């Protein structure tokens, strides 16, 4: 951490961002947007005192029980995920309920991705995100994840 001579602002170096913590967040009964914004803050590193916008200072996040996330109001029946296959008339639309049954991790990943910067740094920070269906995260025991209540 280096301090500039003319200001009191401290600017972190890339070497300061090496010690990364991992957090486990349970998505059971959580609202999609509120959960996603908290995860995005942790991935970017905004929860740290030494946050520097141009350095990947964020921590890793493991989201479990992705299939138990919910939406408020009538959005459960109205929300549609769209993508284009690349072919003529290749626009596909999948309702939220079908996507939740088919690929629940995509729902959370899509929401978090929209809250991250659309730059190389944002893509690098997204690599620290793991979304799991179910509550078993034994494969990540080596990272010594901390259970976080959001």
UniProtKB/Swiss-Prot annotation:
Protein keywords: Ribonucleoprotein, Ribosomal protein
One example GO MF annotation: structural constituent of ribosome
Any one Gene Ontology BP term: negative regulation of translation
Q: Which InterPro entries match?
A: Ribosomal_uL13 (IPR005822), Ribosomal_uL13_bac-type (IPR005823), Ribosomal_uL13_sf (IPR036899)
What this protein is reported to do is described as:
This protein is one of the early assembly proteins of the 50S ribosomal subunit, although it is not seen to bind rRNA by itself. It is important during the early stages of 50S assembly.
Q: Which NCBIfam families match?
A: rplM_bact (TIGR01066)
Q: Which HAMAP family match?
A: Ribosomal_uL13 (MF_01366)
Q: Could you tell me what this protein is called?
A: Large ribosomal subunit protein uL13
Q: Which organism is this protein's natural source? A: Chlamydia caviae (strain ATCC VR-813 / DSM 19441 / 03DC25 / GPIC) (Chlamydophila caviae)
């Amino acid at each position: 951490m280096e301090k500039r001579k003319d200001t009191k602002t401290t600017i972190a170096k890339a070497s300061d961002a090496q010690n990364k913590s991992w957090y486990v967040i349970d998505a059971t009964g959580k609202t999609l947007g509120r959960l996603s914004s908290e995860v995005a803050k942790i991935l970017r590193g905004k929860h740290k005192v030494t946050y520097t916008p141009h350095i990947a200072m964020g921590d890793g996040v493991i989201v479990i029980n992705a299939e138990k996330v919910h939406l408020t109001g009538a959005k459960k029946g109205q929300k549609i995920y769209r993508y284009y296959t690349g072919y003529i008339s290749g626009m596909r639309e999948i309702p939220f309920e079908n996507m939740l049954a088919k690929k629940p991790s995509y729902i959370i990943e899509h929401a978090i991705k929209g809250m991250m910067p659309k730059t190389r740094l944002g893509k690098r920070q997204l690599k620290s995100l793991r979304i799991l269906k179910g509550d078993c995260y034994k494969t990540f025991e080596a990272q010594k994840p901390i259970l976080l209540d959001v």
